[in-house]
Design a protein with these regions (language model features):
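Conserved catalytic-core subdomain
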Residues: 12-112
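Short, basic/aromatic recognition patches
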Residues: 1-8
Length: 112
């Protein structure tokens, strides 16, 4: 099926992360990532990205539903191995990954 990763859901049907990454979505000018109480990993890259995101975007930790993936404009995955990755598509939805993704890549490169 040519999948690179799988999205994981908790028992409440909320998205928590993928098999190896934290997940962030951009919905208008607001970045959302699942809260720790939903079951995601509290990784070091997640913490760093949250601090970077707050410099430019409105930010919330809130539950993400599968429907939210249909309305957001970007989906970003992160972990300490590769940093950030922009997702091109999930099911039939295509994402542009032009704003948040580029901002995070540039911000991380400036830290190096």
């Amino acid at each position: 099926n040519n999948f690179d990763d799988v999205i994981l859901f908790n028992t409440n049907n909320n998205i928590i992360e993928t098999t190896n990454s934290n997940l962030f979505i951009l919905n208008y000018n607001k970045v959302i990532t699942p809260p720790l109480k939903d079951g995601c990993v509290d990784g070091s890259m997640r913490k760093l990205l949250i601090s970077i995101i707050k410099n430019k975007y409105e930010f919330e930790e809130e539950s993400i539903s599968e429907n939210d993936l249909d309305t957001c404009s970007e989906v970003i995955l992160s972990n300490s191995t590769y940093g950030v990755r922009g997702i091109k598509n999930i099911n039939k939805k295509t994402y542009n990954n032009s704003n948040l993704y580029k901002y995070l890549i540039n911000s991380l490169n400036n830290l190096i």
